[in-house]
Amino acid sequence: MVEVAGVSPPEQTSAGLRTLVRQAALKRGPGMDRASALTNSLLDERYEVGKRLGEGGMSYVYLAKDVTNGETLAIKVLTPKLKEDKSSVERLRREAGLAMRLDHPNVCRILRLGETEDGLIYLVMPYLAGELLSDREVRQGALPLDLGVPLLVQMCRGLQHAHDLQIIHRDLKPENVMLVPDDKGPGGVRAVVMDFGLAKERRQEPEVAKLTATGIVLGTPEFMSPEQIRGKPLDPRSDVYALAIVAFEMFTGQLPFQGRNAQEMMIARLRGKPKLLREVKTDLPARLESVLGKAMALDPADRFASMQGFAEALEGAEESGVFAKLFRK
């Protein structure tokens, strides 16, 4: 691991701590249910299942190969406990329906929703060979401006595409962004926003709205907007807020809201007082601090109205940083 001046050692950064938790979960090994032990099996007489790539509260993710064409894929299988919950199954079906409409180089779409004869429900997605943004942050520390801003702009473009289709991500975090090799991309990579598992259409019919009205706040506490914490309706500005927190961590290795646990960080967000970017890294442009501050405004009305607006402001902030460096020279 490489230490970067002015940034905490990777294992002490917020991304590093989350990575340790994720790695510990994988080391626990498979549980007793079939969904957690599919490695080296043939799923639905079509997919050769390889190693387990990860797990979450709702699913297990595996590397797989489609035996009909040899394509390498990622398959997300719903946990048995949740598949017995009709609302969870409906949520997954909605996820597939929404994400199948996505078609953009900076988002990962879902190819197929399937169900085996014995009731395992799964999603088939392209396998992205690359590095999670969270792992890059652990390995390299804070990203330089000339890499971080272009990657954020790519994320904005992918999310704008989703928002144009009335889809809100609702769970943006570094663990849901893959950096895939791309000769034309900044630093030879391209950012792909993944896991629209909590995605939600903005304009819902009453019966659809009931599917997500479970009384449980969904999302990742460190990155949720104040309105998401309160269980209020979400719109593109909620994703703007979450992406701004992702950006803050990218450039500093720290989160803008502090607390001893997730609950305290959520309370801090409801009070609307994030750390200032340049309190953590003084060499970053003042304009970038202003842009992220606006994106993290407590009131959604004070944020950028769209990802397009956020992207344009980020590009302007990067230019201001370049000119400032030239002026200092």
Task: Identify the function of each model-found stretch.
Residues K65, Q160, T220-K325:
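C-terminal lobe helix-coil module of Hanks-type protein kinase domains
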Residues C156-I167:
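Protein kinase catalytic-loop region centered on the HRD/HxD motif
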Residues L133-L143:
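AlphaC helix of the protein kinase catalytic domain
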Residues K83-K86, P181-P226:
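Activation segment of protein kinases
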Residues L151-L152:
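Activation segment signature within eukaryotic-like protein kinase domains
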Residues T79-R101:
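AlphaC helix of the eukaryotic protein kinase fold
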Residues R112-G114:
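A short, aromatic-enriched beta-strand patch in the conserved N-lobe beta-sheet
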Residues D118-L132:
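Conserved short submotifs of the Hanks-type protein kinase catalytic core
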